[in-house]
């Protein structure tokens, strides 16, 4: 879960991590599936990182010793410091761009990765304690947080339990500046940890026979804090809850952590995701949407099949399929109709997703694969990343802070945006192509694994070279695949239409060939439209034979432009008001639009336009030559005035407004 922010600089013997703090956005979703519940005995754990679209994500490798003993990690915004006690291990991580625009909160957020000791981690799924707890043990402004913890844990942890102990000791000494859920795994076990308040936390060794789906809240119920083999807890976790008068005890006499530390009400954005996630992995679950409590540790229901890695990967694409709820990534839409629209797990706002698969037969130092998407997995294939890789492709580590055609994140994310522009028609077909590509990678994986394991038994360095080579090949294939999707989808949709009020009429005009984008990926719906653009649209609708209008009809018409023949057609057929002077590049006014459109309809369909009185409050501001046209178009409901009954004749039109008008006359 994104907080905000971090930047790592290394100069000489000192590495300084610049971290800017801000409030977290609560939208990440975590999952764990114990190895007894999976089809192949794998232990599975992962999360989505959700915050905002258009935020560069990368896959970056860090060689052993990149961070030196004595180097200091500093959060310059809140003052958190961590001094490295030894040189860093080799690891890879999935950070933000280090070159983000100044108007965007800064930070790297290493987020997730593997190190050479075989520890896989993700940080974090953010959460908040209740107000009463915060008064007793408030978050520490200078404490550790998600922006910093991933880096020093990957750099030094040598086991999953060791990762918990490292983070716990840091919280004991310096406190935590936010609430979080984190997960650490190695070859032997997976640990789940909740950080509740400034100094309180509990971690458990995750049982092999359970599964969990956990959005942004605390989920641990009753925990035996005396079970030192399977539990690591802060010493005052019970005392703080009692002092806050929020302490809740289970029937077994154990502290109920979720009931004691959570806010009283579960956010509906959390309820929708935990409910849909449980039902996705356990189709026979009977837990209702309005359940008083959702358990962290779930059993598979009778009749439900064991969980495959594909099930776990597809969980992060879940959009309430098979339910009565409608997925919405738009908060305003959800608030307007909360019974219908719900926040899904699979969201366009997912910046990256990662799922760790600890596999039987893999070596201790590289115990599994991290499946990864840079961008939302909705329309991006999962790529298997071996734990021992030495490098990633130029496209996967591209640091560009804004759109770059050579960045995997940006190209793949544009595919998500293009599909979201017309999800109704493009969603299923694009997903089918993504899954087909994904399954192709999965089909090749066993042979790659076999050769890698054979090499690993002989020479770990050669095995790492091999896994790096194969990973680069898969990354290259995935990039080319997403480029192909981008090229095809950009012909029928645009990437800047998500949640736009005119999305559907815009798509209609694009697919009918009446309007085109301002470039391959953008429609620019809020950009004003020029006279030449509007005349061109009407010419396309009227199926004008351009060959008949090659001769320039007015001194203001420039030859060789996209609009030349259409402007000649408009002049010859007297479609333009005299005031327009056949100047194509000027922005179109609303009254000019009304006149030109009406003249076109008269020419095309022999439409009869009668004189009529205007009822708009600003009718006196409409030019005499446009009044009949405005009256006709409003009577036919082809155009409308403002909510306060004005026509605003001298205002310009946007491309979106024109698309809506074209849709109206096409009914």
Regions from the language model: what does each represent?
Residues 244-361:
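Glycine-rich, aromatic-lined ligand/substrate-binding cores of catalytic
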Residues 430-492, 510:
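Histidine-centered catalytic/metal-binding microenvironments
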Residues 329-454:
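Substrate-recognition/cap regions that form aromatic- and gly/pro-loop-enriched pockets
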Residues 163-172, 312-316:
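Short, well-structured alpha-helical segments that form the helix of a local strand-helix-strand
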Residues 490-504, 511-591, 597-627, 640-652, ...:
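Feature responds to low-complexity, polar/acidic, surface-exposed segments characteristic
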Residues 1-4:
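N-terminal secretory signal peptides that target proteins for export/translocation
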Residues 6-24:
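Sec-dependent N-terminal signal peptides of Gram-positive bacterial secreted proteins and lipoproteins
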Residues 28-145, 166-291:
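A contiguous strand-loop segment
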């Amino acid at each position: 879960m994104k907080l905000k922010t971090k930047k790592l600089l290394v100069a000489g013997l000192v590495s300084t991590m610049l971290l800017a703090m801000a409030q977290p956005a609560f939208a990440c979703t975590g999952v764990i599936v114990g190895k007894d519940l999976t089809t192949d005995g794998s232990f599975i754990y992962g999360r989505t990182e959700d915050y905002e679209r258009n935020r560069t994500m990368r896959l970056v490798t860090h060689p052993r010793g990149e961070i030196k003993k004595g180097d200091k990690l500093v959060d310059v915004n809140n003052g958190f410091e961590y001094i490295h006690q030894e040189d860093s291990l080799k690891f890879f991580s999935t950070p933000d761009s280090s070159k983000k625009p100044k108007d965007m909160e800064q930070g790297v957020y290493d987020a997730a990765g593997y190190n050479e000791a075989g520890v896989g981690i993700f940080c974090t799924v953010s959460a908040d304690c209740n107000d009463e707890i915060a008064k007793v043990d408030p978050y520490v402004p200078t404490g550790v947080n998600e922006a910093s913890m991933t880096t020093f844990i990957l750099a030094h942890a040598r086991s999953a339990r060791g990762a918990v102990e490292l983070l716990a000791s840091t919280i004991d000494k310096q406190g935590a500046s936010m609430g979080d859920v984190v997960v650490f795994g190695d070859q032997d076990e997976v640990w789940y940890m909740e950080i509740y308040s400034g100094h309180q936390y509990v971690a458990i060794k995750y049982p092999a026979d359970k599964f969990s789906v956990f959005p942004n809240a605390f989920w641990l119920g009753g925990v035996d804090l005396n079970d030192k083999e399977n539990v690591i807890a802060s010493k005052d976790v019970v005392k703080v809850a009692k002092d806050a008068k929020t302490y809740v005890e289970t029937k077994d006499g154990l502290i109920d952590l979720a009931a004691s530390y959570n806010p009283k009400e579960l956010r509906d954005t959390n309820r929708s995701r935990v409910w849909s996630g449980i039902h996705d992995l356990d189709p026979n679950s009977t837990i209702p949407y309005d359940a008083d409590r959702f358990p962290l540790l779930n059993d598979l229901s009778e009749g439900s099949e064991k969980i495959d890695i594909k099930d776990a990967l597809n969980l992060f694409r879940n959009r309430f399929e098979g339910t009565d709820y409608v997925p919405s990534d738009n908060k305003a839409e959800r608030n307007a109709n909360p019974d219908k629209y719900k926040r899904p797990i699979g969201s366009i706002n997912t910046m990256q997703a990662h799922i760790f698969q600890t596999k039987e037969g893999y070596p201790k130092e590289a115990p599994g694969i991290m499946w990864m998407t840079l961008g939302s997995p909705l329309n991006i294939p999962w790529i298997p990343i071996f734990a021992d890789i030495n490098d990633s492709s130029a496209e996967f580590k591209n640091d560009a802070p804004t759109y770059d055609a050579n960045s995997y994140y940006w190209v793949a994310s544009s595919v998500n945006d293009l599909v979201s522009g017309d999800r109704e028609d493009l969603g299923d077909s694009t997903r089918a192509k993504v899954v087909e590509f994904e399954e192709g990678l999965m089909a090749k994986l066993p042979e790659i694994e076999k050769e890698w394991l054979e090499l690993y038994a002989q020479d770990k360095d050669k095995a790492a070279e091999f896994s790096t080579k194969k990973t680069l090949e898969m990354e290259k294939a995935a990039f080319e695949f997403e480029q192909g999707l981008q090229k095809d989808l950009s012909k029928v949709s645009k990437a800047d239409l998500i949640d736009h009020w005119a999305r559907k009429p815009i798509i209609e005009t694009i697919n009918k060939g009446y309007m085109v984008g301002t470039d391959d990926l953008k429609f620019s719906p809020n950009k004003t439209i020029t006279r030449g653009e509007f005349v061109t649209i009407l010419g396309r609708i009227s199926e004008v034979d351009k060959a008949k209008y090659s001769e320039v009809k007015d001194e203001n018409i420039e030859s060789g432009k996209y609009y030349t023949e259409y402007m000649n057609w408009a002049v010859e057929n007297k479609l333009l008001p005299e005031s327009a002077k056949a100047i194509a590049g000027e922005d179109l006014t609303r009254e000019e639009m009304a006149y030109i459109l009406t003249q076109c309809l008269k020419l095309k369909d022999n439409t009869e336009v009668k004189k009529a009185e205007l009822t708009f409050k600003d009718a006196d501001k409409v030019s005499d030559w446009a009044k009949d046209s405005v009256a006709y178009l409003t009577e036919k409901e082809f155009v409308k005035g403002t909510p306060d009954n004005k026509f605003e004749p001298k205002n310009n039109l946007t491309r979106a407004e024109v698309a809506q008008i074209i849709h109206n006359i096409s009914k």
